[in-house]
């Protein structure tokens, strides 16, 4: 990112969600002080079917979406959820104050999903 520029970006918007953790990008941005904006914090929808995520949500009395957003915040990401439904937008705000344990955060980070983030260095433009 910085090999052609001397200006460090303030924000890097990348696909980050439970099960879609781009460790190299996360580490690099944290090292450079770049805020990570988590585009697609709910993944491709399969996150809502994951038993482990449902169990964490039930334990906290929250929805899977709220848990995904709480995980993003716990990882110091800025999640960017998309919705046009007022009730879902309001529900998303209930993610604040959810305290996930380190074990729960690790489960969410490493959960197996099939629809990961595309790697730019592997794309054929």
Give the role of each language-model region:
Residues 1-125:
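Beta/alpha (TIM)-barrel catalytic core signal, keyed to glycine-rich beta->alpha loops juxtaposed to Asp/Glu
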């Amino acid at each position: 990112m910085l090999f052609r520029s001397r200006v460090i970006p303030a924000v890097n918007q990348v696909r980050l969600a439970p099960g879609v953790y781009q460790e190299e990008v996360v580490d690099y941005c944290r090292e450079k002080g770049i805020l990570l904006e988590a585009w697609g914090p709910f993944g491709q929808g399969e996150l809502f079917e994951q038993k482990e995520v449902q169990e964490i949500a039930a334990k906290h009395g929250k929805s899977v979406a709220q848990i995904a957003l709480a995980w993003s915040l716990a990882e110091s990401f800025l999640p960017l959820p998309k919705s046009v439904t007022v009730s879902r937008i309001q529900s998303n705000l209930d993610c604040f104050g959810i305290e996930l344990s380190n074990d729960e955060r690790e489960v969410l980070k490493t959960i197996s999903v099939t629809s990961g983030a595309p790697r730019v260095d592997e794309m054929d433009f």
